[in-house]
Curated annotation (Swiss-Prot):
It comes from Strongylocentrotus purpuratus. Component of the cytochrome c oxidase, the last enzyme in the mitochondrial electron transport chain which drives oxidative phosphorylation. The respiratory chain contains 3 multisubunit complexes succinate dehydrogenase (complex II, CII), ubiquinol-cytochrome c oxidoreductase (cytochrome b-c1 complex, complex III, CIII) and cytochrome c oxidase (complex IV, CIV), that cooperate to transfer electrons derived from NADH and succinate to molecular oxygen, creating an electrochemical gradient over the inner membrane that drives transmembrane transport and the ATP synthase. GO terms for cellular component: mitochondrial inner membrane; respiratory chain complex IV. Binds 2 heme A groups non-covalently per subunit. There is a cross-link at H240-Y244 (1'-histidyl-3'-tyrosine (His-Tyr)). This is Cytochrome c oxidase subunit 1.
């Protein structure tokens, strides 16, 4: 019975739970890799004594965190659990395809870990640029395994996004028009289209790389009339939308959390928030070359990409100010999800500001491939996406499990994590401005102080992670009843009769009634 329930599941709640559990495990693997990186960099001199191994760990850390932690949790976990509940649907549109979409992820993960375990590992960075990833500089099957891993993860995402798009278009309860769709549903909807348009480009690029490596094509080899810069264009045409794929569901979640704990019926500027997400999605495809300012583009091209990148700050700023407007003057409950959300509003904005700095192609010439870039994207991912996952998890945990997390210890966890990530990544801005390059396992003595502080912060973050595992155990062990929200919320997911909602949510089709005041 249990085998058929979890292995052959066609239930959106069970599949969402599988995604959340898988993402948690993958997150621990990715965190372990980041600890190896920070241990190597804690002091000058070598710990691993092998740059190739160091680069393999860096590559695997990035790919694990992106494809096996953030995406499965945000889109697979929260998306599967919440979207049917929020739109009043009995399940997803294609339940069996949903199951397949999940079960492609563990084999993909195994392939990625295998790529690190055979030959010399794939020490290419997550960008897999040729000629470093060619069969001359990376002989053996490591890069091929990594490519197959990405193919599988991409196939999984494609199946998932077909499901989400179909569900959101066709399975809304009567009365729920698109302009009444909860913001989290909108965010996953936009994210699904970003995946739909960007993943095939990645698939094409890595397939071309695969043939270059194995059957003597020369797409990226100048000796045969190819161009390695073509790979960079293809990769970043996927890679830039990808970073918005990672953060957009988080935007949706924190809009819900802020609305909920401000005691409001709906978010401030609902329509503006929706259009801002769509604008971010569209603009995300028009700025890819800002990752390649140093490849020798002419000045007009660089001017365009600088300007277009800065324009993305407008809809993003609109979201930040809408969140602040919602908080302003409301009777806040200082609950755990709200703390995470306020952390995001502050720290994501900080990361966005360093992004504006890097958008200037002339400044990026100096800062490209330094730790300033590392600091920038870890502020928006480690303190945007990851904090959003914690905000969403702590907010909806009573809905998922029927139990509530320990309120005080949850806040303790937040403060440990807050100190840890800031201590890890803030000093990296200084290292970058001082010229320390990325992806090196050793550095001159002048950089010792900030690297040591950064590594201490990393240790604190690990303590926070272990404390979080204890929090989850504690919640299930003590079985405190989940606290039902005191006031009805505009979002449907809290309206069901039990926590968690029954295995099959409905006995009959629900309908939404709009009360005009």
């Amino acid at each position: 019975m249990q085998l058929s329930r979890w292995l052959f599941s066609t239930n959106h709640k069970d599949i969402g739970t599988l995604y959340l559990i898988f993402g948690a495990w993958a997150g621990m693997v990715g965190t372990a890799m980041s600890v190896i990186i920070r241990a190597e960099l804690a002091q000058p001199g070598s710990l691993l004594n092998d740059d190739q191994i160091y680069n393999v760990v860096v590559t695997a850390h990035a790919l694990v965190m992106i494809f096996f932690m953030v995406m499965p949790i945000m889109i697979g976990g929260f998306g599967n659990w919440l979207i049917p509940l929020m739109i009043g649907a009995p399940d997803m549109a294609f339940p069996r395809m949903n199951n397949m979409s999940f079960w492609l992820i563990p084999p993909s993960f195994i392939l990625l870990l295998a790529s690190a375990g055979v030959e010399n590992g794939a020490g290419t960075g997550w960008t897999i640029y040729p000629p470093l990833s060619s069969n001359i500089t990376h002989a053996g099957s490591s890069v091929d395994l990594a490519i197959f891993s990405l193919h599988l993860a991409g196939a999984s995402s494609i199946l998932g996004l077909i499901n989400f798009i179909t569900t959101i278009i066709n399975m809304r309860t009567p009365g729920m028009s698109l302009d009444r769709l909860p913001l989290f549903v909108w965010s996953v909807f936009v994210t699904a289209f970003l995946l739909l348009l960007s993943l095939p480009v990645l698939a094409g690029a890595i397939t071309m790389l695969l043939t270059d490596r194995n059957i003597n094509t020369t797409f990226f080899d100048p000796a045969g009339g190819g161009d390695p810069i073509l790979f960079q264009h293809l990769f970043w045409l996927f890679g830039h939308p990808e970073v918005y794929i990672l953060i957009l569901p988080g935007f949706g979640m924190i809009s819900h959390v802020i609305a909920h704990y401000s005691g409001k019926r709906e978010p401030f500027g609902y329509l503006g928030l929706v259009y801002a997400m769509i604008a971010i999605g569209v603009l995300g495809f028009l700025v890819w070359a800002h990752h390649m300012f140093t490849v020798g583009m002419d000045v007009d091209t660089r001017a365009y990409f600088t300007a277009a990148t800065m324009i993305i700050a407008v809809p993003t700023g609109l979201k930040v100010f809408s969140w602040m407007a919602k908080l302003q003057g409301s009777n806040l409950q200082w609950s755990l999800p709200l703390l995470w959300t306020l952390g995001i509003v502050f720290l994501f904005t900080l990361g966005g500001l360093t992004g504006i700095v890097l958008a200037n192609s002339s400044i990026d010439f100096v800062l490209h491939d330094t730790y300033y870039v590392v600091a920038h994207f870890h502020y928006v991912l480690s303190m945007g996406a990851v904090f959003a996952i914690f905000a969403g998890f702590t907010h909806w945990f009573p809905l998922f499990s029927g139990y509530s997390l320990h309120p005080l210890w949850g806040k303790v966890h937040f403060f440990i994590m807050f100190v840890g990530v800031n201590l890890t990544f803030f000093p990296q801005h200084f290292l970058g401005l001082a010229g320390m390059p990325r992806r090196y396992s050793d550095y001159p003595d002048a950089y010792t102080l900030w690297n040591t502080i950064s590594s201490i912060g990393s240790t604190i973050s690990v303590v926070a992670m272990l404390f979080f595992l204890f929090l989850i155990w504690e919640a299930f062990a003590s079985q405190r009843e989940g606290i039902t929200p005191e006031f009805s919320h505009a979002s449907l997911e809290w309206q069901y009769t039990s926590f968690p909602p029954s295995h099959h949510t409905f006995d009959e089709t629900p309908s939404t009634i709009i009360i005009v005041k």
